[in-house]
Design a protein with these regions (language model features):
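Primarily membrane-embedded glycan-assembly and transfer machineries that use lipid-linked glycans
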Residues: 1-74, 110-173
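Short, solvent-exposed helix-helix connector turns and helix-capping sites enriched
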Residues: 35, 81-82
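Short A/G/S/P-biased low-complexity tracts
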Residues: 40, 80-81
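Membrane-interface alpha helices of multi-pass inner-membrane proteins
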Residues: 54, 70-76, 83-106, 137
Length: 173
């Protein structure tokens, strides 16, 4: 059982991510020429969605963090900001390995961007470098007493093999 302050922080992180996602929804809607009222309604629908409430505040799931990171990845990919896409996606994969299941969509977006603009490979390469730096910064503190990088590969293999489906909460046949 977590002490009260630890439990509050544990619940606060997913709830804060939900609020940031709601604000991002508003900003994207405004950018796509929605009126302030329309964008506000979308933001409120996102912020007060009962499923989101239950997932983050009720069950204290970290899925809201992953959702926000993937939402940012999609947003920056659409904007063509590959130097932001790559490190944020790496962070999403490090938060929850299930983010790897969307990697093929990212690859398709990269291929399409390269077809449209052959000069975007430079920001993409910089983004890959930033993703590697992100991985090193996040993983290094946990690797001190693990004896190499194999612990992380084993952890990901174990985690991904424990999920035969993309989700365990729906009607998988």
């Amino acid at each position: 059982v977590l002490p009260l302050s630890a439990a509050a922080v544990h619940k606060l992180i997913p709830m804060a991510c939900d609020l940031v996602a709601a604000v991002l929804t508003y900003r994207i809607a405004r950018k796509k020429n929605a009126s302030a009222n329309q964008a506000g309604i979308l933001m409120l629908l996102m912020a007060f969605n009962p499923a989101i409430f239950l997932n983050s505040a009720g069950w204290c799931q970290i899925d809201s963090v992953l959702s926000l990171l993937l939402m940012l990845v999609a947003y920056f990919a659409v904007c063509g900001n590959w130097m932001a896409v790559m490190p944020i996606y790496m962070l999403a994969v490090l938060v929850k390995p299930q983010a790897l299941m969307l990697g093929f969509l990212g690859l398709a977006a990269i291929v399409m961007a390269l077809i449209r603009d052959r000069k975007c490979w430079k920001p993409m390469l910089i983004g890959v470098g930033l993703a590697v730096v992100t991985a090193v910064i996040v993983v290094l503190p946990f690797s001190v007493n693990q004896g190499g990088i194999s612990w992380l590969i084993d952890k990901y293999a174990q985690t991904l093999s424990s999920y035969p489906y993309a989700t365990v909460n729906t009607a998988n046949f």
